[in-house]
Amino acid sequence: MATPTGETQPAKHQEVGHKSLLQSDALYQYILETSVYPREPQPMKELRRITAKHPWNLMTTSADEGQFLNLLLKLINAKNTMEIGVYTGYSLLSTALALPEDGKILALDINRENYEIGLPIIQKAGVAHKIDFREGPALPLLDQMLQDEKCHGSFDFIFVDADKDNYLNYHKRLIDLVKFGGVIGYDNTLWNGSLVAPADAPLRKYVRYYRDFVLELNKALAVDPRVEICQLPVGDGITLCRRIS
């Protein structure tokens, strides 16, 4: 979807909403044009435009959320990070640009082909050396890492934007891998507004299927004494969990 300024937006999930949960499209466009696009690094702008042409572009991180993650990582002085769910690498590039020169990202995804769409831009941006990309399911690798005491509490920040039906399985493992005071960010925790949609809302099949898993995650995080949480209506909803015990 092209905007009045010529920018291409990702496709909508379904009729209930889109990548912004704001009720006003005009207000969301104002945020993008005033605060996001003018500050968006050129490599991220280039990758966003390329990704917008991909048939699965609704999987990408929104531009305002990419900006949010970039600033958050700088605020917490993150150095060692993990990302589960990479797609073409927009949020990955946002992270890589925020980290110091010796920062590291363990990037996990089941599809290398999608990652390679953004890889030339990541390389051109001079941050590819920060990324350790692993293709395959994340859970077996997380279980392997948990067997190594050196991995416990070793990550400053972990971002999860992958299979929603495994979010709780990820959380059970990631809580031991993130350091005390470190942050885990779960994406899509408002799931396009479908969490409060009427029973007869025109939800796509996959949205309706994953809805219950997102609801289950939100309920679990709300009562988890090991973390402080903050759920924000940025992008499709992101919940930040700061480990405290």
UniProtKB/Swiss-Prot annotation:
Q: What does the UniProt cofactor note say?
A: Binds 1 divalent metal cation per subunit.
Annotated coiled-coil segments of the chain: none
Name recorded for this polypeptide: Caffeoyl-CoA O-methyltransferase
Which keywords label this protein? Lignin biosynthesis, Metal-binding, Methyltransferase, S-adenosyl-L-methionine, Transferase
Catalytic activity entry: (E)-caffeoyl-CoA + S-adenosyl-L-methionine = (E)-feruloyl-CoA + S-adenosyl-L-homocysteine + H(+)
The UniProt similarity line reads: Belongs to the class I-like SAM-binding methyltransferase superfamily. Cation-dependent O-methyltransferase family. CCoAMT subfamily.
What does this protein need as cofactor?
Answer: a divalent metal cation
MF terms (GO), sorted A to Z:
caffeoyl-CoA O-methyltransferase activity; metal ion binding
Tell me the enzyme class. transferase
SS bonds (residue pairs) = none
Which residues of the sequence carry a binding annotation for substrate? 19, 161, 192
Q: Is Transferase one of the keywords?
A: yes
* Entry EC no(s): 2.1.1.104
Residue sites binding S-adenosyl-L-methionine per the record: 61, 83, 85-86, 91, 109, 138, 163
Report the function annotation for this chain.
Methylates caffeoyl-CoA to feruloyl-CoA and 5-hydroxyferuloyl-CoA to sinapoyl-CoA. Plays a role in the synthesis of feruloylated polysaccharides. Involved in the reinforcement of the plant cell wall. Also involved in the responding to wounding or pathogen challenge by the increased formation of cell wall-bound ferulic acid polymers.
Task: From the UniProt record, report the name of the gene that encodes this protein.
Answer: CCOAOMT
Q: Which residues bind a divalent metal cation?
A: 161, 187-188
Membrane-spanning intervals of the chain: none
The pathway to which it is assigned is: Aromatic compound metabolism; phenylpropanoid biosynthesis
The alphabetized list of GO BP terms reads: lignin biosynthetic process; methylation
Its organism's taxonomic lineage begins at: Eukaryota, Viridiplantae, Streptophyta, Embryophyta, Tracheophyta
